[in-house]
Amino acid sequence: MDPHKKVALETEFFTEYGEASRYQIQEVIGKGSYGVVASAIDTHSGEKVAIKKINDVFEHVSDATRILREIKLLRLLRHPDIVEIKHVMLPPSRREFRDIYVVFELMESDLHQVIKANDDLTPEHYQFFLYQLLRGLKFIHTANVFHRDLKPKNILANSDCKLKICDFGLARVSFNDAPSAIFWTDYVATRWYRAPELCGSFFSKYTPAIDIWSIGCIFAEMLTGKPLFPGKNVVHQLDIMTDLLGTPPPEAIARIRNEKARRYLGNMRRKPPVPFTHKFPHVDPLALRLLHRLLAFDPKDRPSAEEALADPYFYGLANVDREPSTQPIPKLEFEFERRKITKEDVRELIYREILEYHPQMLQEYLRGGEQTSFMYPSGVDRFKRQFAHLEENYGKGEKGSPLQRQHASLPRERVPAPKKENGSHNHDIENRSIASLVTTLESPPTSQHEGSDYRNGTSQTGYSARSLLKSASISASKCIGMKPRNKSEYGESNNDTVDALSQKVAALHT
């Protein structure tokens, strides 16, 4: 990048935020109605990060509440398979700030782009992708959180096959003792990934099984390269679901809350289920058996994330020590969901959440400090024009133009208010293409430095999502050998996954 443009970039993005000198802006990687996302270098750690500037946060209380919800959930749900907020910049004024700068770990693409750009993903990819999603979902559900909008675009991806769940703006926390909750909402899940019990219903009593259905749809999309249930409307959605799964039994239809949808299914001609071996030819029978469980029409027949992880499909990969649970989120954290809040209320709540990333000021706040304005003296001069420069130059085809993915999670585009097939149960895992698996696990990278640039924090100019996960450029050993997290709170690094799986494969040949 031209040095003069670099200086302009670094003096226009952050406006008044004095902490901005910590980050060296690299390029724009996303832009939408919410604001701008830029990649940057954290000069304290040398890491590449994504910084999302959210404009006019408090223009609509509903949008501000969604942002508050996601910032809070991502702080409380820290897990290797969930995108991480690394920092939130302290605003220049407690009472008057309008924009928020959230610093995320930088991810290269999302699962939607990976599926679209790769027609040669292997069974090992499918297995490891699904394993990560279920492992993250187990953690989310043990916190009594329902994600409610799982889809490929809401799953970030790196070229080492690491996936991370993101976009928690529509998530909800259940505080009922019963394993279900009732929510009034204007939007739940993109239709294609929406569980049948939610079709046409905005007032829904449901369970974590809604997320399990979404995971099943995502898994099927991995296997075929295209969405499984691309419904054009609610009726069409029900039609294509039943075309594959067959007409549901009366007790399953009774669980549909929308009266019209319930009546439509009750009057539908009887359809036999399509064998999954016909719909998904050449797919591992164990994978199809698990998929059939995930896509059970009746939510009570779907497994929990923990039960799915125990499926024989993950034999040799799943390990309870690497699949941590967590405690339910305390009710006090989401007390604001139970009352009507004003713009001033949500501003104070977001400010309080930002202070979680500024421990010294948090202590002062908790002691009752009343400081309401703390302008940074050099902030305006250094960053005043940066945002305008980013908007002006975004999407002009210059070097380093962004990928389609908005690489950080928070927040989504603003959403307007709406106007068992029997698998091969005794199939032995030891017979599952062992020679192919060993070859893949032992295959060396195509070059000595393959895949190292991103992990070392250096730039990858010209990187394309189309190259992501190509078999010619990445081996399953690298896929399964995820980058270890420093000081892992879960007791062992992800390299142990490789060791365990490699030992298992070796044992199969003895």
UniProtKB/Swiss-Prot annotation:
Keywords: ATP-binding, Kinase, Nucleotide-binding, Phosphoprotein, Serine/threonine-protein kinase, Transferase
InterPro entries listed in its UniProt record: Kinase-like_dom_sf, MAP_kinase, MAP_kinase_CS, Prot_kinase_dom, Protein_kinase_ATP_BS
GO molecular function ontology, one term from the record: protein serine kinase activity
Gene Ontology cellular component terms for the protein in this record: cytosol; mitochondrion; nucleus
Signal peptide: none
E.C. no: 2.7.11.24
Post-translational modification remark: Dually phosphorylated on Thr-185 and Tyr-187, which activates the enzyme.
Residues bearing the modification Phosphothreonine: 185, 190
Motif (TXY): 185-187
Reactions that this protein is recorded to catalyse: L-seryl-[protein] + ATP = O-phospho-L-seryl-[protein] + ADP + H(+); L-threonyl-[protein] + ATP = O-phospho-L-threonyl-[protein] + ADP + H(+)
Phosphotyrosine: residues carrying this PTM: 187
Family statement: Belongs to the protein kinase superfamily. CMGC Ser/Thr protein kinase family. MAP kinase subfamily.
Protein name according to UniProt: Mitogen-activated protein kinase 9
Organism per entry: Arabidopsis thaliana
Gene that encodes it: MPK9
